[in-house]
Amino acid sequence: MAKSHTLNPEEEFEEESGLRPSLLSEFIGQKEVLNNLTVYVQAAKNRKRALDHVLISGPPGLGKTTLAGIISNELGTRLTITSAPVITKGADLARLLTSMGENEILFIDEIHTLPKKLEEILYPAMENYMIDLVIGEGVTAQMVQIPLKPFTLVGATTRSGLISEPLKSRFGIQLRLDYYNDEEMKQIVLRSSKILGVLIEDDAALEIGKRSRKTPRIANHLLKRIRDFSEVEGNLSVKKNLCLKAFEKMGIDDLGLDGMDRQILDCMIDRYKGGPVGLKAIAVVVGEEEKTIEDTYESFMVRIGLINRTPAGRVATEKAYRQLKRMEDFSVHHGQDPTLF
């Protein structure tokens, strides 16, 4: 796979590529997505035509960029990676589209942030492999159609609800990635440890997986930090006891909550008696952006039952109080007898 990093200065794909699976057969988890994608890719190969445009949605770190790379590898074609926030002008998008070779893949991350005027450039490009450009200004301006080579747009989003219906409907293939289970996370840690040359016991890999918020990207980051602790202590292999000590030092609990998670929950409990409370109020208190809280922290805590989203705002659940060992506060806030807890 040849990669082009147009308009992507951070090159995050390269930084993590060593641990990313490169083929569908190497990808762990997301069975339904993989089974369907295998069929779609094979059909495109058999027809020797561009794969239908693909929209991949789901929380951060679950493998959206990785799947774009896998599609490119499986089809044996070039992948160009960019992100919607850095495409600010129609000329940027036109340059990307006209640079695409036949059946090549254009990956646009955070596609839900693409401005409407740029979306409208994509419509004919996705449907008819054409773009309409205005040449000149004023009364002399002319609309010129520029043909494109057949290509596949792979869009990734953490907020599929923010994508306009006209754009969403042009993706013939729509895939949703979900959080991984503990066994899948363990297998991901074992695979990554082999690539990194880290000897690790199964129960240690499971412990890392359980504290990785059901997210492979976080699992890989934690594995590297556990490796640091293990090497400094002079251990030949990573054991569960070392993981437990390292996680305690890093402030990561048995559910994978870190300091910011606890700060968010403490804010809800201490200032708002558990809620309901608005996202903006939480963001002001903890000093973090609303989008970051919603995408990175809150979505996971909602998933595991620590926060409920209600029409009136966010509410900390009984499980959240229990996890923070604050059941006396729960009884006070909910008018119950503290001795019950």
Curated annotation (Swiss-Prot):
Root EC class: hydrolase
InterPro entries xref list: AAA+_ATPase, AAA_lid_4, DNA_helicase_Holl-junc_RuvB, P-loop_NTPase, RuvB-like_N, RuvB_C, WH-like_DNA-bd_sf, WH_DNA-bd_sf
Binding site for DNA: R309, R314
GO cellular component labels: cytoplasm; Holliday junction resolvase complex
Amino acids binding Mg(2+): T65
Binding site for ATP: L19, R20, G61, K64, T65, T66, R170, Y180, R217
SMART domains, per database record: AAA (SM00382)
Keyword DNA repair: yes
SUPFAM superfamilies listed in its UniProt record: P-loop containing nucleoside triphosphate hydrolases, Winged helix' DNA-binding domain
Xref: CDD domains: AAA
One function term, GO molecular function aspect: ATP binding
Subcellular location: Cytoplasm
Region (Large ATPase domain (RuvB-L)): 1-180
GO biological process, one term: DNA recombination
Reactions the enzyme catalyzes: ATP + H2O = ADP + phosphate + H(+)
Alphabetically ordered keywords of this record: ATP-binding, Cytoplasm, DNA damage, DNA recombination, DNA repair, DNA-binding, Hydrolase, Nucleotide-binding
Keyword check for Aminoacyl-tRNA synthetase: no
Function recorded in the entry: The RuvA-RuvB-RuvC complex processes Holliday junction (HJ) DNA during genetic recombination and DNA repair, while the RuvA-RuvB complex plays an important role in the rescue of blocked DNA replication forks via replication fork reversal (RFR). RuvA specifically binds to HJ cruciform DNA, conferring on it an open structure. The RuvB hexamer acts as an ATP-dependent pump, pulling dsDNA into and through the RuvAB complex. RuvB forms 2 homohexamers on either side of HJ DNA bound by 1 or 2 RuvA tetramers; 4 subunits per hexamer contact DNA at a time.
Domain comment, as recorded: Has 3 domains, the large (RuvB-L) and small ATPase (RuvB-S) domains and the C-terminal head (RuvB-H) domain. The head domain binds DNA, while the ATPase domains jointly bind ATP, ADP or are empty depending on the state of the subunit in the translocation cycle. During a single DNA translocation step the structure of each domain remains the same, but their relative positions change.
Protein name as annotated: Holliday junction branch migration complex subunit RuvB
Taxonomic lineage: Bacteria, Pseudomonadati, Spirochaetota, Spirochaetia, Leptospirales
